[in-house]
Amino acid sequence: MAILVLGGAGYIGSHMVDRLIEKGEEEVVVVDSLVTGHRAAVHPAAKFYQGDLADREFMSMVFRENPDVDAVIHFAAYSLVAESMKKPLKYFDNNTAGMIKLLEVMSEFGVKYIVFSSTAATYGIPDEIPIKETTPQRPINPYGESKLMMETIMKWSDRAYGIKFVPLRYFNVAGAKPDGSIGEDHSPETHLLPIILQVAQGVREKIMIFGDDYNTPDGTNVRDYVHPFDLADAHLLALNYLRQGNPSTAFNLGSSTGFSNLQILEAARKVTGQKIPAEKAARRSGDPDTLIASSEKAREVLGWKPQFDDIEKIIASAWAWHSSYPKGYDDRD
């Protein structure tokens, strides 16, 4: 059989492709528009197509040329929360409407399994910590709303067309392939750890810590972090779960251990050996005190066991990437 990875040139998707190629059990087909992804991030052993998943004619061609594809792993989506607040229609068009087009083509070609990279942003400001799969989903931004709508669309497609699905919900992804060959390269960069490491590199002057009066031990936001290889393993376990005939269901993924912004900063200083200047700033609106996802269900049902369960190990892998490629993939004008 073969697996189609959508968004396989992106940060998490490229690690998924790398993991699949490393296993060597089935052919890997990648589709990416390269709007935010990087061609150099895609393992050379994967079969690559550049195009938009919302282009039905293009996607039909991909499935037609790869009749062994029986499953889709879907990472292709816009994911900037702040941008989604300013450009909500862009997110509903690309993320939500794109899912409709994809499912139409999957149904046409009889592809019955999809593992979907969702987000814990579908929960909004949660009623409980750690967040469980049963926690009410009340997104507070168009990005989270678009992903929740995608989950809903898949639910009804399962009932109507028998397309089985697993949405995986998680928060902060951090780290890179330990040999430093692939990693995180966003433009603009909005994630805490790569920004901290850019300060360590001298690319940025300082890191801004937004808010020091949250209801947490040191007053800064607490978040959980998961490595992209651990996410890749979870996606593959979820796919195997579906292939074994199990029902569609959602799983939360996370370390189940929270780290504050200051703890991440101190750990990065230790790993890099750099001072990493920091400055405190006012809170950003809409930032909850603590966000930690419970991964108990994934561990019990899927047998998921994160290998990168030490935050310093995660940071060290990211630092290896930043040290190897200080300008990232350097493929943007």
UniProtKB/Swiss-Prot annotation:
Pathway: Carbohydrate metabolism; galactose metabolism. NAD(+) binds at residues 11-12, 32-37, 52-53, 75-79, 94, 119, 143, 147, 171. It catalyses: UDP-alpha-D-glucose = UDP-alpha-D-galactose. It is an enzyme of class 5 (isomerase). It comes from the Bacteria. Keywords: Carbohydrate metabolism, Galactose metabolism, Isomerase, NAD. GO terms for biological process: galactose catabolic process via UDP-galactose, Leloir pathway. It holds the Pfam family Epimerase. Its cofactor is NAD(+). Belongs to the NAD(P)-dependent epimerase/dehydratase family. Involved in the metabolism of galactose. Catalyzes the conversion of UDP-galactose (UDP-Gal) to UDP-glucose (UDP-Glc) through a mechanism involving the transient reduction of NAD. Homodimer. This is UDP-glucose 4-epimerase. It comes from Streptococcus mutans serotype c (strain ATCC 700610 / UA159).
